[in-house]
């Protein structure tokens, strides 16, 4: 393929930028965005479904960054882990899973405890409470001491909903004398993914030591109430010990999150050789398993092994002899690389990656710009070098600031991204570069509930798709009623590369 004859494509993913005509709680509607408004009015555009069955999730289940980027890269609808695991519970295959029974048998033989760790909510983004309930059923069968280490959500759910989910678990374990809730911890601590090891360490110590944040009360609901009285929401609950059952030699440990990126640091604190995050305890003969593969470099058995995926967009670009660049800040780096490539860690031949560090702050509403300006400068530099035929860039701002629930900061973040788009447009103005602007899911478009309470979770609204090709501005029409699965076939169509049979998405170009 003659690379010089190709019009380079820039795929710009505005993370968390949904489309809604409802102005209430809509930071995108409230923001001053003259650039993207002009593009929407003057270039071919359509709306894409980014939630539910359109991205391999249950009906009306909100999309998320992992699923969104996987679907964009796949060019097909893939049944996501949430669906696969829930289906296995429904058809009872879950209760015959070899790896789970292996874990429980090990603890029976060693007369030790089984520890279950994961996000306790019905958010469905990283985990699901029904999967935890199914594990507790297996615990009843084996009658081994089972310790629950519950991570509270408040991000993919309402900010103060943890008591509802914990109560559901209490109702189950009241019938099961050998199961106890041993720790709680907000996901801010247990699910950091930006190497803020001081947060992970606090969660780790609650699980392995008696010295961490003990409570005189063993009533977990009262403990949560006390935190609420201090205006501490679920996401930020300090790691707290409820029962004195530590993780010790010969114990077993099950991680039930199915999405790996935010639980990986906590896993590493137990399992990674030559771990350097903080000083950890020596725990011998610890048997580990994870619901899905969290880290391919660790030989940890999984309950639901990865299914082989081939002919993702990045692989096809590479096989066609084209060069590509993936560009994101820390918070979304895994999404434009690992997830976009179908769970493959290593870059494809001809694929370069650039990571811009996210700011080290408590919450991202403190600097709504995050690293958007640095990202934009790197993108402009890459465009000017004329090395790449395909560039993927992710702007994290709408999603990450949207998750804070801070409306004013989110509006500012949206306006900053709009300014960055303007700089990119000036750069490609007199070139043959093609810019595609889209998103992976909604968030900043829905920040207030019907009860006027802050909403920090994603929305199920569609996302925009704008095709900016100055050489064919008036000649291109786009299909309506598309989905994220149609983006990769559209890009291959523009590049005049055959769309593989594995891609069941369709080109959006009519």
From Swiss-Prot:
Enumerate the cofactors the protein uses.
Answer: Mn(2+)
Q: What does this protein do?
A: Catalyzes the interconversion of 2-phosphoglycerate and 3-phosphoglycerate.
- Name this protein carries in UniProt: 2,3-bisphosphoglycerate-independent phosphoglycerate mutase
Cofactor stoichiometry and binding? Binds 2 manganese ions per subunit.
Gene Ontology CC entries for this record: chloroplast; cytosol
Query: Residues in the active site?
Result: 65
CDD domains according to UniProt: iPGM
Q: Which gene encodes it?
A: gpmI
Task: Show the taxonomic lineage.
Answer: Eukaryota, Rhodophyta, Florideophyceae, Rhodymeniophycidae, Ceramiales
InterPro entries linked: Alkaline_phosphatase_core_sf (IPR017850), BPG-indep_PGM_N (IPR011258), Metalloenzyme (IPR006124), PGAM_B_sf (IPR036646), Pgm_bpd_ind (IPR005995)
Sorted alphabetically, the Gene Ontology BP terms of this entry are:
glucose catabolic process; glycolytic process
Q: Which domain of life is it from?
A: Eukaryota
Any Pfam family matching the protein: iPGM_N
Record keywords: Isomerase included? yes
- Going by the record, the broad EC class of this enzyme is isomerase
């Amino acid at each position: 393929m003659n690379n010089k004859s190709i019009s380079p494509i820039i795929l710009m993913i505005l993370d968390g930028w949904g489309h809604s005509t409802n102005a209430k709680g809509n930071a995108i509607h409230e923001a001053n965005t003259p650039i993207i408004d002009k593009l929407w009015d003057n270039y071919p555009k359509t709306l894409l479904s980014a939630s539910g069955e359109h991205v391999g999730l249950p009906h009306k289940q909100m999309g998320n960054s992992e699923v969104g980027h996987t679907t964009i890269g796949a060019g097909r609808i893939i049944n996501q882990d949430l669906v696969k695991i829930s289906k296995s519970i429904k058809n009872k295959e879950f209760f015959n899973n070899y790896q789970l029974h292996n874990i429980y048998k090990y603890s029976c033989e060693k007369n030790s405890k089984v520890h279950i760790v994961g996000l306790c909510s019905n958010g469905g983004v990283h985990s699901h409470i029904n999967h935890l309930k199914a594990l507790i059923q297996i615990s009843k069968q084996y009658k081994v001491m089972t310790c629950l280490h519950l991570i509270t959500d408040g991000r993919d759910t309402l900010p103060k909903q943890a008591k509802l989910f914990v109560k559901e678990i209490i109702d189950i374990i009241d019938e099961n004398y050998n199961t106890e809730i041993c720790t709680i911890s907000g996901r801010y601590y247990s699910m950091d993914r930006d190497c803020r090891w001081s947060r992970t360490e606090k969660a780790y110590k609650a699980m392995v030591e008696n010295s961490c944040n003990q409570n005189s009360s063993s009533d977990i609901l009262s403990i949560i109430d006390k935190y609420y009285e201090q205006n501490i929401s679920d996401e930020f609950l300090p790691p707290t010990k409820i029962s004195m059952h530590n993780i010790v030699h010969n114990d077993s440990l099950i991680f039930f999150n199915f999405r790996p990126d935010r639980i990986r640091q906590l896993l590493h604190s137990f399992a990674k050789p030559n771990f350097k995050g903080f000083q950890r305890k020596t725990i011998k003969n610890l048997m580990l398993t994870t619901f899905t593969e969290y880290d391919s470099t660790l030989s940890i058995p999984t309950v639901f092994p990865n299914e082989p995926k081939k002919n993702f967009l990045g692989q096809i670009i590479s096989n066609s002899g084209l060069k590509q660049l993936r560009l994101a800040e820390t918070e979304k780096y895994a999404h434009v690389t690992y997830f976009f490539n179908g769970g493959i860690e290593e870059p494809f031949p001809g694929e370069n990656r650039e990571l811009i560090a996210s700011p080290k702050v408590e919450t991202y509403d403190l600097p709504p710009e995050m690293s958007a300006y640095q990202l934009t400068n790197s993108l402009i530099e890459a465009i000017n070098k004329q090395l790449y035929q395909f560039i993927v860039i992710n702007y994290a701002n709408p999603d990450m600031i949207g998750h804070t629930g801070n409306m004013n900061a989110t509006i500012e973040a949206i306006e900053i991204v709009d300014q960055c788009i303007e700089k990119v447009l000036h750069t490609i103005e007199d070139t043959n570069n093609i810019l595609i602007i889209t998103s992976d899911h909604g968030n900043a478009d829905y920040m207030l509930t019907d009860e006027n309470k802050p909403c920090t979770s994603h929305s199920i609204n569609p996302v925009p798709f704008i095709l900016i090709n100055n050489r064919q501005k008036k000649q291109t029409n786009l299909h309506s009623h598309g989905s994220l699965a149609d983006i990769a076939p559209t890009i291959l169509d523009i590049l005049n590369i055959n769309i593989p049979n594995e891609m069941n998405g369709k080109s959006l170009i009519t």
